[in-house]
C-alpha cells in the first residue's frame, strides 16, 4: 500500500469488515481507496461514516450499492456525490440494475453526470 500511495495509484478493494476498512483509510490518508458496493457488505451507515471521515475513500455503487431505492439519494444528501463512482459487478450482476439505480433515483443531472463519469475522470486525472 505504501508503494501505491507513493506512485499516486488508486487501489480498488472489495469490502471486508468495517474495522478493516476504517483502519486502512486511517493508516493510509494519502492513498486513494475505492471500495466496491456502497451499501453492501457491512452496512450502509458505516460506509456513510467512512465517507464522512476519510476524504481519500470513494465507493462504487455496483451491485449491492444501490439495491434499495433511496440509498443513493440518502448518501448524496448526507455526504455529497463527489466520491461516488458508477460501477457494475459484471459478470456477477448485469449492469442494467446499476444504470437504473442512477437514472431512476431523484438526482440532478449534475449528480448523474458526476456519478456516471465526472468523478472517475477527476479521480483518474482525465481532463474533459
What are the functions of these language-model segments?
Residues 81-83, 96-128:
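Mid-to-C-terminal alpha-helical segments outside catalytic/metal-binding sites
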Residues 1-85:
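Catalytic pocket-lining loop regions of alpha/beta-barrel enzymes
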Residues 74-78, 89, 117-119:
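Aromatic-enriched hydrophobic runs in primary sequence
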Residues 4, 37, 59, 89, ...:
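Conserved, mostly hydrophobic/aromatic
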Residues 87-91, 95:
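C-terminal active-site rim and adjoining tail of enzyme catalytic domains
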Residues 40, 92, 122:
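Active-site micro-motifs of SAM-dependent methyltransferase domains
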Amino acid at each position: 500500500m505504501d508503494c501505491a500511495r507513493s506512485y499516486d495509484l488508486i487501489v480498488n478493494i472489495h469490502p471486508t469488515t468495517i474495522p478493516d476498512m476504517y483502519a486502512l483509510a486511517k493508516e493510509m490518508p494519502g492513498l486513494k481507496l475505492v471500495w466496491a458496493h456502497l451499501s453492501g457488505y457491512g452496512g450502509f451507515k458505516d460506509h456513510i461514516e467512512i465517507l464522512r471521515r476519510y476524504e481519500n475513500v470513494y465507493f462504487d455503487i455496483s451491485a449491492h450499492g444501490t439495491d434499495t431505492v433511496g440509498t443513493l439519494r440518502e448518501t448524496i444528501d448526507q455526504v455529497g456525490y463527489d466520491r461516488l463512482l458508477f460501477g457494475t459487478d459484471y459478470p456477477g450482476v448485469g449492469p442494467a440494475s446499476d444504470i437504473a439505480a442512477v437514472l431512476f433515483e431523484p438526482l440532478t443531472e449534475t449528480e448523474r453526470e458526476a456519478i456516471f463519469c465526472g468523478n472517475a475522470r477527476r479521480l483518474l486525472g482525465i481532463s474533459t
